[in-house]
């Protein structure tokens, strides 16, 4: 494994030497010596890795080599960047630059000679162990091959909810009965070991039709081993009252009575997933009243937790799969479309498969991991190698004894070891995140890119391809929403995360810092070899200022529940080689981002999302290698952004502050590599800056009253690769006379469109992109019903009308309209009184939300014809709505076919 990581580092080093050959002139002799040693090194690595598991010395050699490769890259890149910074104008600058250049060149030559000698010494020691030259041979897929496989994956990867449902059907029905029909039990507990399927079972119960009809509100909170009381209470309250914007500002003393009172007055179902200890319940329980009405479904590895929470608790013991069920689940993963095709499995492969699943101990997680491993093997010899690899190291059975647990761990580890090197890198990066984290995939993709785990396609395409590979192998869980093929979030099962942490420790991949007294969650024998830090506690920042961490490449803040303060600029002084710096939600003393940030010249990723910052230093101009920059800070006053972003020519992602002061003027026209640009403002930049940004996929633009709409249209016309566009006009702009110029039909790739544009009526359907899938209209003040136009956009999957998008009295959804619509939301339409839905309209609708439409008299009668509808949310509507739509109400016939009808804040 380490060989793969070293080879990956060597590839990056060779790329750097090739790319910067012109700037490296003058040290040719030293570079030639380095290259000779690197070639010798590459020929030894494969055999070294084969001997690694049997020799601590070989393992240490590989770690030494990895350090040497990193050091060489740091030395060369630092020299190139310093040379680049010195390329100024003027005689005095030229003299100073020449003197500094000669000094730097002498130093880099000396440093390279030092690295070369260290590599030579390591090679000599490795050769003394008899390691023979073996060709390093793992081939990566080409970009074209990956795109082809990506299309196949999108077509064949099974929906997780379907593939999970093996051997649990009877258990689901039993649990639903206890929750819905039996008032004796207020707490129902699902107990069992990790990986046995407790969460899968709870999820099926949570979404069951009878459960969704029975309760008024629902909350799902994953507690896990490390939680904060405030976070758990906030999550419950947020799910029960999602539109209360004050919840995140509440402390425990405010949350406790509010949540207690809410649970006393309603019929709610709460799921507490993964509660580890009785003491955890004791910390949480103060918000739960004894009064019956609400119910709780609790999952835990400890059967005693549920009984401790409620002595009358019904404890349900999750059972392992029998051999037949295990093989059925494995088949669904390996052959996701076998039921639809004539695929016939070789008898020998089937026999091996059935034998291999016995080593999974009946645990669904292990079965799915094995299925993901076998899905990439298509011949008898390949399956035999997997079988031999499992069988030679474990003796398993169909019951959960120690041997079975060892076999499960081995299968999960095999799934990792079977990954190609580039996927191992990506998988181990998930070790940064705390247990049970929902990881935002866009951030993850940009982390990968910042560390060089990125190819010639766009960051989004590259990231999606590799994440889909990990999901397909059942190493990662992703939320594949039916409205989109894209994954927005991903997470890991806790047993798989343990494998990830174990492998990350083995590879010295990162160090997790929780607090000043506990800094070794993943700590190598030599802490200095950890080049990545993940901060899980706000108390840990001072460690960075006082420890010497000159080789750290990645620093990610991964906990948001507590305050993170940076009170000293010195925190950056010892981190000069950072590539990744995520300071999301961090608070800076005095609101100032230290000017020392400009010394982090190697940075590729910088996030200040939600950080308390009121001042950005001009030294940021030195961050010329940035690929990702998020400046969406939490500023109460408009922030000044210095005009230095124009020098960050490598940027792929840029999110600007929502509010910038009047003095801010940004020249962004040279940022031609941008793929994502958000909060671009024509008040602070010229709309013509967009002309050359032809690689843009996602654009959010705010247009001022001084904007020339003809120029806007011509600039946007060049952005033919756009997939998402949000246009926000200042409220004072009257757009009635201009919307006709705003033609969007040439955006052939545009899938998502958001418009906050004043217009008397919606444009004709021919002005919209041909494949538009999602549209959100806000504050449009349309007087004419938009539905007759929108329903003719044949590819629409979701429509949202919000806060004055329409100010008329009546809307009509006609027969045959919206043929593919899955989700519809109508919010804050204060003048809407009547909504007509004709039979045959919206035949695929699955989710409907009605929110705060005070004059709307009733739900349309035509909803009874939409048999596809699975979820109806009624939020902040009059009490009469709820009274008419509950069983026995006069309008119940309209919604009785809908499995999940929720009333949220409708008791006023």
UniProtKB/Swiss-Prot annotation:
Q: Any idea where the NB-ARC domain is?
A: 146-459
Which intervals of the chain form a coiled coil?
A: 15-57
Q: What's the short name of a Pfam family annotated to this entry? A: Rx_N
Q: Which GO terms describe its molecular function?
A: ADP binding; ATP binding
Matches recorded under InterPro entries: Apaf_helical (IPR042197), LRR_dom_sf (IPR032675), LRR_R13L4/SHOC2-like (IPR055414), NB-ARC (IPR002182), P-loop_NTPase (IPR027417), RX-like_CC (IPR038005), Rx_N (IPR041118), WH-like_DNA-bd_sf (IPR036388)
One GO BP on record is:
defense response to other organism
Q: Does the keyword ATP-binding apply?
A: yes
Q: Which family does it belong to?
A: Belongs to the disease resistance NB-LRR family. RPP8/HRT subfamily.
Written domain comment of the UniProt record? The LRR repeats probably act as specificity determinant of pathogen recognition.
Protein name (Swiss-Prot/TrEMBL): Probable disease resistance RPP8-like protein 4
Q: Which organism does this record belong to?
A: Arabidopsis thaliana (Mouse-ear cress)
Name of the gene this protein is made from: RPP8L4
């Amino acid at each position: 494994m380490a060989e793969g990581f070293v080879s990956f580092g060597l590839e990056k080093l060779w790329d750097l030497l090739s790319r910067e050959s012109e700037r490296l002139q003058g040290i040719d002799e030293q570079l030639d010596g380095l290259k000779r040693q690197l070639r010798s090194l590459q020929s030894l690595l494969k055999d070294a890795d084969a001997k690694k598991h049997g020799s601590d010395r070989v393992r240490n050699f590989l770690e030494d080599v990895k350090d040497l490769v990193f050091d060489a890259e740091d030395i060369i890149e630092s020299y190139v960047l310093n040379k680049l910074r010195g390329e100024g104008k003027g005689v005095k600058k030229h003299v100073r630059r020449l003197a500094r250049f000669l000094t730097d060149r002498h130093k880099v030559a000396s440093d390279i000679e030092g690295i070369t000698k260290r590599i030579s010494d390591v090679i000599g020691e490795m050769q003394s162990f008899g390691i023979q030259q073996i060709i390093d041979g793992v081939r990566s897929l080409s970009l074209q091959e990956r795109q082809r496989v990506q299309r196949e994956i999108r077509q064949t990867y099974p929906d997780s909810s379907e593939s999970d449902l093996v051997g649990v059907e009877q258990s689901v029905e039993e649990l639903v009965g206890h929750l819905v029909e039996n008032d004796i039990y207020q707490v129902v507990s699902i107990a069992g070991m990790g990986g046995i399927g407790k969460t899968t079972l709870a999820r099926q119960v949570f979404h069951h039709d009878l459960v969704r009809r029975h309760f008024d509100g629902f909350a799902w909170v994953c507690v896990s081993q490390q939680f904060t009381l405030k976070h758990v209470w906030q999550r419950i309250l947020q799910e029960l009252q999602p539109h209360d914007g004050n919840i995140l500002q509440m402390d425990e003393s405010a949350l406790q009575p509010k949540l207690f009172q809410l649970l006393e007055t309603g019929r709610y179902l709460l799921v507490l997933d993964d509660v580890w200890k009785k003491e955890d319940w004791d910390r949480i329980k103060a918000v739960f009243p004894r009064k019956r009405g609400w119910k709780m479904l609790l999952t835990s590895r400890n059967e005693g937790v549920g009984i401790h929470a409620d002595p009358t608790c019904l404890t349900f013991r999750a059972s392992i799969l029998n051999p037949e069920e295990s093989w059925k689940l494995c088949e669904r993963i390996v052959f996701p479309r076998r039921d639809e095709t004539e695929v016939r499995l070789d008898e020998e492969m089937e026999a091996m498969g059935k034998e291999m699943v016995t080593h999974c101990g009946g645990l669904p997680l292990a079965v799915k991991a094995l299925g993901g491993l076998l899905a990439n093997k298509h011949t008898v010899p390949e399956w035999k190698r997997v079988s031999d690899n499992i069988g030679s190291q474990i003796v398993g059975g169909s019951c959960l004894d120690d041997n079975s647990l060892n076999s499960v761990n081995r299968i999960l580890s095999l799934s990792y070891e079977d990954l190609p090197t580039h996927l191992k890198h990506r998988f181990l990066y998930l070790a940064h995140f705390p247990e049970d984290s929902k990881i935002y995939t866009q951030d993850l993709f940009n982390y990968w890119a910042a560390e060089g785990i990125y190819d010639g396609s766009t960051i989004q395409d590259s990231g999606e391809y590799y994440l889909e590979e990990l999901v397909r192998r059942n190493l990662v869980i992703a939320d594949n929403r039916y409205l989109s093929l894209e994954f927005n979030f991903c997470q890991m099962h806790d047993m798989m995360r343990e494998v990830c942490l174990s492998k990350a420790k083995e590879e010295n991949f990162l160090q997790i810092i929780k607090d000043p007294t506990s800094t070794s969650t993943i700590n190598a024998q030599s802490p200095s070899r950890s080049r990545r830090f993940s901060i899980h506690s706000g108390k840990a920042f001072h460690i960075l200022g006082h420890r010497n961490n000159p080789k750290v490449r990645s620093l990610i803040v991964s906990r948001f529940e507590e305050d993170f303060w940076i009170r000293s600029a010195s925190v950056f002084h010892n981190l000069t080689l950072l590539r990744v710096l995520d300071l999301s939600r961090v608070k800076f003393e005095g609101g100032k981002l230290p000017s020392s940030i400009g010394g982090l010249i190697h940075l590729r990723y910088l996030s200040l999302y939600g950080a308390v910052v009121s001042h950005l230093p001009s030294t940021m101009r030195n961050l010329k290698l940035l690929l990702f920059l998020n400046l969406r800070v939490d500023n109460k006053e408009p922030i000044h952004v210095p005009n230095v972003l124009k020098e960050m020519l490598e940027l792929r992602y840029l999110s600007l502050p929502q509010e910038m002061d009047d003095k801010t003027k940004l020249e962004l026209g040279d940022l031609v590599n941008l793929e994502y640009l958000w909060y671009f403002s024509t008040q602070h930049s010229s709309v013509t800056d967009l002309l050359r940004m032809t690689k843009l996929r996602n654009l959010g633009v705010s247009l001022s009253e001084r904007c020339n709409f003809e120029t806007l249209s011509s600039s946007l016309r060049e952005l033919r690769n756009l997939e998402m566009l949000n246009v926000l006009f200042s409220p004072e702009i009257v757009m009635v006379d201009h919307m006709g110029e705003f033609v969007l039909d040439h955006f052939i790739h545009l899938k998502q469109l958001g418009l906050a544009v004043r217009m008397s009526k919606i444009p004709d359907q021919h002005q919209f992109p041909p494949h538009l899938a999602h549209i959100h209209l806000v504050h449009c003040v349309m007087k004419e019903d938009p539905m007759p136009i929108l329903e003719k956009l044949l590819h629409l999957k979701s429509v949202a009308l919000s806060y004055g998008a329409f100010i008329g009295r009546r809307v009509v959804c006609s027969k045959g309209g919206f043929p593919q619509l899955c989700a519809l939301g109508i919010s804050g339409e204060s003048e809407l009184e009547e909504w007509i839905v004709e039979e045959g309209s919206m035949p695929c609708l699955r989710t409907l939300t009605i929110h705060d439409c005070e004059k709307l008299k009733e739900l349309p009668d035509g909803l009874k014809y939409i048999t596809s509808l699975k979820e109806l949310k009624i939020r902040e509507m009059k009490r009469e709505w709820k009274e008419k739509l509950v069983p026995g109400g006069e309008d119940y016939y309209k919604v009785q076919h809908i499995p999940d009808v929720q009333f949220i804040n409708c008791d006023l």
